[in-house]
Amino acid sequence: MSNQSSSGSNTSDLDEESASSLVSSAASPFIDSDLETPRPNISRASTGQLAEDGDTSSQHEDSSEELKRQEVRGMRRHSDLSIDAKLGSSEGSTASSALPLTPRSPSNASWLLVRGGLLDSPILDINSVTQKSNLLNELKQVRSKLAALEHENGILSLQLSSSNKKDKNTSSVTTLTSEEDVSYFQKKLTNMESNFSAKQSEAYDLSRQLLTVTEKLDKKEKDYEKIKEDVSSIKASLAEEQASNKSLRGEQERLEKLLVSSNKTVSTLRQTENSLRAECKTLQEKLEKCAINEEDSKLLEELKHNVANYSDAIVHKDKLIEDLSTRISEFDNLKSERDTLSIKNEKLEKLLRNTIGSLKDSRTSNSQLEEEMVELKESNRTIHSQLTDAESKLSSFEQENKSLKGSIDEYQNNLSSKDKMVKQVSSQLEEARSSLAHATGKLAEINSERDFQNKKIKDFEKIEQDLRACLNSSSNELKEKSALIDKKDQELNNLREQIKEQKKVSESTQSSLQSLQRDILNEKKKHEVYESQLNELKGELQTEISNSEHLSSQLSTLAAEKEAAVATNNELSESKNSLQTLCNAFQEKLAKSVMQLKENEQNFSSLDTSFKKLNESHQELENNHQTITKQLKDTSSKLQQLQLERANFEQKESTLSDENNDLRTKLLKLEESNKSLIKKQEDVDSLEKNIQTLKEDLRKSEEALRFSKLEAKNLREVIDNLKGKHETLEAQRNDLHSSLSDAKNTNAILSSELTKSSEDVKRLTANVETLTQDSKAMKQSFTSLVNSYQSISNLYHELRDDHVNMQSQNNTLLESESKLKTDCENLTQQNMTLIDNVQKLMHKHVNQESKVSELKEVNGKLSLDLKNLRSSLNVAISDNDQILTQLAELSKNYDSLEQESAQLNSGLKSLEAEKQLLHTENEELHIRLDKLTGKLKIEESKSSDLGKKLTARQEEISNLKEENMSQSQAITSVKSKLDETLSKSSKLEADIEHLKNKVSEVEVERNALLASNERLMDDLKNNGENIASLQTEIEKKRAENDDLQSKLSVVSSEYENLLLISSQTNKSLEDKTNQLKYIEKNVQKLLDEKDQRNVELEELTSKYGKLGEENAQIKDELLALRKKSKKQHDLCANFVDDLKEKSDALEQLTNEKNELIVSLEQSNSNNEALVEERSDLANRLSDMKKSLSDSDNVISVIRSDLVRVNDELDTLKKDKDSLSTQYSEVCQDRDDLLDSLKGCEESFNKYAVSLRELCTKSEIDVPVSEILDDNFVFNAGNFSELSRLTVLSLENYLDAFNQVNFKKMELDNRLTTTDAEFTKVVADLEKLQHEHDDWLIQRGDLEKALKDSEKNFLRKEAEMTENIHSLEEGKEETKKEIAELSSRLEDNQLATNKLKNQLDHLNQEIRLKEDVLKEKESLIISLEESLSNQRQKESSLLDAKNELEHMLDDTSRKNSSLMEKIESINSSLDDKSFELASAVEKLGALQKLHSESLSLMENIKSQLQEAKEKIQVDESTIQELDHEITASKNNYEGKLNDKDSIIRDLSENIEQLNNLLAEEKSAVKRLSTEKESEILQFNSRLADLEYHKSQVESELGRSKLKLASTTEELQLAENERLSLTTRMLDLQNQVKDLSNIKDSLSEDLRTLRSLEDSVASLQKECKIKSNTVESLQDVLTSVQARNAELEDEVSRSVDKIRRRDDRCEHLSGKLKKLHSQLEEQHETFFRAEQQRMTQLGFLKETVKKQEKLLKKLNLRQEQLIPRSSILVYESYIRDIEKEIIVLQERLNGIELSQQLPKGYFGYFFKTNRVEMEVLDSFKQQVAKLQFLAGAEFIVKFKEDLEKCAAEEKEKQATFDNYSEKVENLGKSIEALYFALNREISFRKSLALSKSAYHNLLVRDSPKFNPDSQITYSIPVTNTKQSLLRSAILCVISLQRLRLLGQRHSFCEEVIENLSCV
């Protein structure tokens, strides 16, 4: 329909355009001669005849007449070309001059198609065109009418020529009867016009008919498409049926193979039967040879007779047996058709059993025969010759038995071959199973993974066994080390608390980091998961610890029982030695376990990755398992359906099975009867053999009697013997007769049974027929069940393979289970023992915990006592000072000191002992230093990123060594003090005398001292107890030192490994040198403080030493009074020394602790700072993202505006183009009109000249001239009318031209406005693009800065995590020592209180500074508010500026020159500056001042912009500083416990920064206020420039001064900013250092977490593997049950499969039905071909009708039209007749081609194009038909194809001829078209000549009355349209006929494809 509408629209357009072109041509009949094209060549007949006519008519004409004819022809050419040009322009084709118009050119057909718009017309079938419309008839009618018109025009032309001749002949010049001629011409013209209009109406009707025909054709095409869809559905159904037929064919072939194999087995059985019968015959022949005597000849004859009868009976029985066997074979064949291979195999097995039974019976019969032979031997012993013969016969008989055995062996070999066949079938089944085993590969992989996991479990079990052995060995060690375990538990608790704190910190950091990046969130989630796993692992570790404790308690109980059992001390000593060895071994194992754990930790990452891979594989396996379960569910549903069907089948089969059982019982009876008959036949054969032997004996005896009568006696004896034998044989014969009678009876019974069985067989055959029908019905469902059976069989094979694999796995698992059970029993026993031991250990542990709690309480009390002692010591020091002064006075007079000097010597000895003790302690300190070095090495090895920290630690170690040196120096000082004491003792001896004098005074004071000493004694007792406890602790420490020494060896090996790691980490240490420098500075400060503290401590120790010495002196003096005080004095001295040492150690530990606390606090503060920095960065990121989003929104808005503006511009351009095209068309029309007017004027001039020449001739008489004058006047009037019409048309065109010009002006105005708007929009776009580029640049810079900051932050974070990790490792190692000495740290509370006071003071200062910061923040807020106000003011200023701009716009509109200048400057400067410039240009006198003000304005604007940018930069710096202030605040809040120096520096920096910020903000405020005032003043001055000239100059001067001041201030602000940036860089470096520390710490935390995760994952793997073992056991049981079920299901499915083969027969019936359906389809196709033939008959009739019509037209033309005009168009009519003849021939050829034989190829000719899918499906169908129909189908099909190929070749030839003739017909139509155009041009030229002639008559003839005559006006008729329509219809018919050629090529392709099948 779309094509129709397009064609209809084209025709309507043609109508309108042709009408307009004709109007224009009527107004302007002439056209320029430059557009002239060559004339077309007319056909042969027409050109020749015209030439002849020209020769005959030109005999009496002059040369002048020929010139006039040439002029007329030129005018015709002009008119033809004008019409063609107009038609070309109206149809839209501008290249009409390029197209040739010759009728014989090959491109004219395409030209007509393009010109007429025929390519858009719909493709129609020739059938529909010829049946539904008589187009050819109508075309011929139209052509005949056109020919009549041409004829009439020819007559007119001849009349005109004759009139011209008469005018030219001077001899026969007469006056023309003008009135008659004019009336004649007018009548003719009116007739022609009426005829022409009638023909136009007829052409219009024909076009309408064409449209209806095309609509009908469209409907038919739609119906045809529906038919195609139906055909495709039929094809799909056929394909499905053929696929089912394929499957049935395959099953039939399989059944045929089975039948062949069964026939082979039957043939082998028959061969065995024949062999047995041949053996029976040989036995009969041997029996016939046994005849001996003549007397027995009668008997023998009787026996022979009997044997013959028996043989006849046997033959009859053989026949019966053969009949039975045939019936049985038929029955077996029925069974073979009904039963499957399994039933046949069962039959074969039954036959084998029967044959085995028959062989057994034959053996029994052979045994009986042997017994009979033995009897014969016994009877014939007398006759030795007979015995030899009998022995030979026996040997031959044995050989025969051997041959029978050989035949049996052969039969067995046949059976073995059949077994091989069965094996081959089974091998095929196994191959199918192997093909399906690939699907079970995944299960095998799972099993391998399970085995791998089982191996791992075994390894873990071995490890557990080793650990349990270690636990058993370490049971005694646990007793000794319970205290150590308690301490370690405490350490673990501390570590757990620290870990919890670190977790809290990490959680806080994670919560802050989650807001930054999603990736970090994911990592933190992973960390949280790891932490949860750690918690789970810790819980599991706690459970394991509890279990271990329980085991240790059990072990302790066991050890106690063992100790109770052990009686002797020798055994105890041996056990101790063994325990020591076990301890050493256990320590070694522990070291190894530690190494293994480390290796496990190192390998954990790889295990983690493998675990992830396993998880992925597990997920994949789960997905596969789900798919398998889905498949199993589907199969289960299918099995349920099959079971339902099976139930139905079983119901039917139950009846069949009953009948089969009855038949089988009958067959068994028949087989038994056959066996008995066979036995009897064998007996008869044996008897016949015996008879034959006897006959041979008789024959021999007779011969012997003939030759020897002498031996008659002996022969008689022999005869007697033979008679006895004969009697025995008769008895046997009687027995045989009885047996034969019995056999006959049995045979009668069997015959009756056979009759019954035959009846049963008939009944069964009827049942079998019903069953076959049922089976045919069942075979319909077989197709659906085959797929299910295949899937079930595949599943069965898979499950069977799985069953086999699982059985093997079950066996292995059962073996492993047995092993595991034994191991588990052993382990359970061990576990029971361990549980008992652990319970005992737990009890002990509880007791020890209670003891530890008590000891803690005692420690608390001791700490309190120590505090009291210190206070008392201080008091004692003050008292001792007083006492020393008193003793100095009393020493001179004290006599008793002589005795005490000896005691001093003893004291010296004790001091020497103490010196030795100090040496030992020094050695212990060295050992401790070595341990510390080892620990430091371990720390170096563990902390991979703290290489420089090792150097710091080494420096600390050197400091410790220096401290040891200082201690050694203190020892030397003690020695010097001892020397001094000796010197003092000498002095004391000198002062004794002085002391004696003061003894009385001392005694008074002694009482007070005794009281104080008593107090001291009490304190010393308490201290002694404490010292005892400390000694126990020291012993424990020594034991621990021994353990540590053993561990140092392990650590040394680890240290070597760690050195390698440190060598790798040295590369990363270069990045951390900056961090370590900062740390070294802090460490140096701390070391300086430590040195100060050490100096103070040395002073204190010296004081303590002095006090100790003085106390020793006092105690010596008191011991002189009381000897008991000496011991206490010694204890005090020792205690003081211990206190010194322990105070030193405590000081060292406190220093280390303080350092670690400081470092931890620094790390925490750094973490908080980093968190705050991250939050700040996140805020910045969010702000920047918001700004970027806003900018993107702005950009999107701008882009939308750009798109909108571009659309508007496009619309404007389109309008402009359309208007320009209209303008060009109008200009062309104008030019055409002018050219036509020029042509008219030229033709008029020529015509006037010719008339004047006629008038001036002398040969013309006066009346002729008068007549000519009258005619001239008459024609002039008509010509004036024509000129009036042309003038009117010209005026109309001029009006149109003016309108177009007006439109053009409007468009020009629009274009100017749009150009102006476009320039403005372009300027705005450029601005927006610049802004967009600036935004993009800023965005890129910000993104780069953000990326750099994020990278720096991540790097810092990584470094901080590494530092934290290293610090945590050091912390974990130092916390052990801190935990040991935590009870003693309370002594330093006084110092801590002092520090707290200092810290409180610092806190107060910090709070004050915070208040200052808050004030500064308030100032910043106020500054921001002022900035916002400033921005508001700026916005108000901008509004004022906008108002000024509006004012200036008004002024600019007044002066166009100023507007041009403004528009020229508008691209480079702002609108404000341009408007100011235009305002300045107004002022002539103030141009200079105004230019200066403009320059100042620009400078101020630039400065304002710079100030705004600076303000923005300052705002950004303020915001950054605010963020940094907040960050520093948080840092300072976290760093309350840091050093004073850092706090002071930071506070000073903050104060400086705040001051600078305040100064900057104040400066910015001042600048903003000043600039705002300046802007306001400047704007006011600009507004009043015309009125206030003098004020402008003064204000400009002031503004210059202020600008200079502002520039200076801005420079100062920039300098301050540079200083701030340097300070900020320093702060950033500090932050980077802290972030690096934090990164190192975070890396250490990650390693710890990874280790914990590894432990957790290992434990989870152990649990998972244990669960997998249990699940495997469950799976084994389930698989076994499943295998049993599957075996049952397999047996059932086999039974089902046996029943389903019966459906094949039904499918064969279906195949027959399909064959019949295909034949029916074939017939339907043939009928369709016949219908097409009938349609061709209708076509023939239509052609005949058209021929008749043509004949009638010819007759009418001959009757109506004279010969002269017929000759012009007769050639065209002949060509058309020839083409119609060709059409008839083509239709005959098509009719012949439609008479096709039956075949499948005609079905595919309906499609218009070759579809490969259709051909492929057709090939498949042909192949299926070949498979179904056999080899004959191919032959028939090839014959059909050959016929088709031959016929289609003939068709091709006819089509080729037809196509050539169609082209010729198209050319002839083109020639007709050209001739018609020429005729139209001729008619127009004739009308013009007639009008000119009329004007001449009016002018020249006085009698002529123009009013009485009808004025001639050129009729405006649509002649060209009707002609085009006729041509269009012709070409449409040609197109339809060409479709036949296309279909012919398509048919050829189809036939070629079919021939390739």
UniProtKB/Swiss-Prot annotation:
Compartments where found: Cytoplasm, Cytoskeleton, Microtubule organizing center, Spindle pole body
| UniProt-listed GO biological process terms | ascospore-type prospore-specific spindle pole body remodeling
Q: List the biased-composition ranges (Basic and acidic residues).
A: 58-83
Bias type Low complexity, positions = 1-12, 19-28
- Residues in coiled coil: 199-785, 804-1235, 1320-1471, 1481-1723
Q: Where is the composition biased (Polar residues)?
A: 90-102
What are its GO cellular component terms? cytoplasm; meiotic spindle pole body; mitotic spindle pole body
Q: Which family does it belong to?
A: Belongs to the MPC70 family.
The record's annotation in PANTHER family points to: CENTROSOMAL PROTEIN 2 (PTHR23159), CENTROSOME-ASSOCIATED PROTEIN CEP250 ISOFORM X1 (PTHR23159:SF31)
Q: How does it assemble?
A: Monomer.
Name of the protein described by the UniProt record: Sporulation-specific protein 15
Give the originating organism. Answer: Schizosaccharomyces pombe (strain 972 / ATCC 24843) (Fission yeast)
